Regions:
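C-terminal structured subdomain/cap of oxidoreductase catalytic cores
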Residues: 17, 26, 205, 209, ...
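Glycine-rich FAD pyrophosphate-binding loop
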Residues: 20-44
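Conserved flavin/dinucleotide-binding core of flavoenzymes
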Residues: 290, 296-403
């Protein structure tokens, strides 16, 4: 089949790489570079990013890693060990040790919660915040986790999503960092697509998607190309806006917003390669120091620390100032330099659909959606994208067989 892919973000490129084995594929990307919110920006020798924090939520064992291997990408992903620690009262604790920081009554409550969550024995209709709120520290820790991983507060996160995430965590484990950062993944996807004779067109903005009974068309200012199938890597809302198909039939997906601050430090802030969750910060939910995995992500003699925070109010300046105050407290007298502050919202958010508000990937036999507006259930960030891509690729390959 001839397949057109609109958008060269992680979702679009992963779909293209998988389909390029058996189909003719063409990617249309509006920017001069591919990778969307998952690629590097070189700034003074530091590998900053267009979005992601150089982390893959289930590391070398999750959905994304599996699909990368399946399409022939050689990406080395180093699993974090420990997955994450939690800074409470200035000290870093493993998850299991947090239970000892509260009184006996709260400890029993928290242990019961953890056991119920592991067994899926919880009310699916409530939020994660409601589930945790009877133990103050548990709610703070929950907020740090959802803020870091989903750019949502615990109260904004549906319990149903948390149950699925817990299942994935027990199946695949915690995060990992790809060597070369986000761009390490994107470069390999591009290599595979080109090896399979796929075509990637940059600076090629798509203005229209026309779906007819027997064909589909991708239209720009100076082109109108015919395809058997179109895969859109744009948000469901934008895809609907430029196409002749009604996509959002029920509730609109709700985007999640966030702020990332990149910090240079000679001394380093943490010794491990996992996440440092910061439940006691005013705004920062967590941070990582990716140079503990790959020193090439910063100039010689430096570490790169990336912090993330949910955007809680619409006053972005105030949100950033509170984040900077947190950083000052976290560094506690150590030398550091703020490299870059990025806020993510509107057309360039953390997620086009916050977890629990994603739409389905399959619109009809000719039009499919991939990306973070259509993640699989319980799929954190790029793992959720990979789950959606898997579904689309299976559907298209089945369609090809039956036609
Ligand atoms: C601050 C922050 C931190 C994050 N941290 C992580 C993390 O550590 N780990 C993780 O797994 N995820 C993380 N994420 C989320 C992850 O970066 C995104 O979910 C993912 O990159 C989105 O990929 P996508 O393919 O859905 O969309 P995009 O990357 O947005 O790709 C869509 C592409 O379509 C192109 N496009 C748009 N309109 C048109 C048009 N009309 N014509 C042609 N092309 C068009 C865009 O230019 C873009 O390249 C983070 C996100 C942010 C913002």
């Amino acid at each position: 089949m001839r397949i057109g892919i609109v958008g060269g973000g992680l979702g679009g490129l992963l779909t293209t790489a998988l389909l390029s084995k058996n189909h003719d594929v063409v990617v249309f990307e509006k920017l001069p570079f591919v990778g969307g919110r998952f690629t590097n920006i070189n700034y003074k020798g530091f590998q900053l990013t267009t979005g992601a924090l150089h982390m893959i939520p289930h590391g070398n064992d999750g959905y994304l890693a599996k699909l990368l291997r399946e399409c022939g990408c050689n990406v080395k992903i180093i699993n974090s060990n420990p997955d994450g620690l939690f800074r409470v009262n200035g000290k870093d604790y493993a998850y299991k040790d947090l239970f000892n920081l509260v009184g006996l009554k709260d400890k029993l409550k928290a242990l019961k919660m953890a056991a119920n969550l592991k067994m899926g024995n919880v009310d699916k209709s409530i939020s994660f915040g409601e589930f945790l709120e009877s133990v103050e520290l548990a709610l703070k820790v929950g907020n740090a986790f959802t803020g870091w991983a989903l750019s949502l507060t615990a109260y904004e996160t549906p319990m149903e999503e948390i149950i699925e995430m817990a299942k994935n965590y027990h199946k695949f484990g915690g995060p990992g960092v790809p060597i070369g950062g986000c761009k390490g993944v994107i470069d390999e996807l591009v290599r595979v697509i080109k090896n399979n004779n796929g075509v990637i067109k940059v600076e090629c903005e798509v203005k229209g998607i026309e779906i007819e009974d027997d064909k589909a068309y991708i239209i720009g200012e100076e082109f109108n190309e015919e395809f058997d199938v179109v895969v859109s890597n744009l948000s469901p809302k934008l895809t609907e806006k430029i196409s002749n198909v009604k996509i959002i039939k029920g509730k609109e997906p709700k985007p999640s917003k966030g702020i990332k601050i990149c910090v240079a430090t000679k001394e380093g802030l943490i010794k491990h390669n996992g996440v440092l969750f910061t439940p006691e910060c005013e705004r920062i939910n967590g941070l990582n120091q990716v140079t503990n995995v790959d020193i090439s992500l910063a100039p010689e003699g430096y570490h790169l620390v990336m912090t993330h925070q949910t955007q809680l109010t619409n006053n972005v300046k105030k949100e950033i100032d509170l984040g900077l105050e947190d950083i000052e407290n976290l560094f506690n007298g150590k030398d550091y330099e703020i490299l870059h502050i990025q806020s993510y919202r509107d057309e360039w958010p953390v997620n086009h659909a916050s977890n629990g508000t994603d739409l389905d990937n399959v619109i009809n036999d000719r039009l499919y959606l991939v990306g973070d507006g259509v993640k699989g259930k319980g799929g954190i960030e790029v793992e959720g994208i990979a789950m959606g891509v898997m579904k689309v690729v299976e559907h298209i390959n089945l369609l090809n067989k039956t036609n």
